Amino acid sequence: GTLEIRGASTHNLQNVDVDIPLGVLCVITGVAGSGKSSLIHGSLPTDAGVVMVDQAAIRGSRRSNPATYTGLLDPIRAAFAKANGVKPALFSPNSAGACPACNGAGVIYTDLAMMAGVVTVCEECEGKRFQAEVLEYTLNGKDISEVLSMSATEAEAFFADGTVTKPAAHAILTRMVDVGLGYLRLGQPLTTLSGGERQRLKLAIHMAEKGGVYVLDEPTTGLHLADVEQLLALLDRLVDAGKSVIVIEHHQAV
């Protein structure tokens, strides 16, 4: 089948008709300003089950991180609570277990009237974000701060281990590794991510959805060539799973 675009006239497009094939990886390419994004974002039918994955900033506070954004923190908290016989809220830096000095931020923000604010590591929790008594609870020898300091790759192995098998957490971590974010720390603030990293984090979430058509806008931005190959392998797997993938891109490897 095809996705039909008729009479596209957004920005510098002039009455363009295009049939985009479905069930394959389709690349929309062209020089900068040629109307690639206008053609797709401005003209795709809204009812086509399309999942748009862009590089726009992720909404969230400076407390947000990959663990909270992907929903990963929920199964992690549940695993800690079950292992220690306490309530899950203790294992959230935004809830009952937060360090009282920095309110779970791990840093102290000092606003200076005439200059840029100053950020210092909290002396009480030493940047770990949790109360000392919460850090005494462990899961397979690791406290919650140590788990949130792990990279996605390390955490994927940790939650696949027979002693802490947690399928919900492992599934999310596997998707993060699949999109090339295996190096990302679970507790890293979202405000520190690049546009390409934000886009791939969104893709990791959308991969769990039932959408039939994925649209990615220049997903290779900021990627090393080896990571581009990993991304292409992922897109191929999406197509093999019956999805349609439309990529707006001018990277020659794609």
What is the predicted role of each segment?
Residues 1-254:
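Conserved phosphate-binding elements of NTP-dependent enzyme cores
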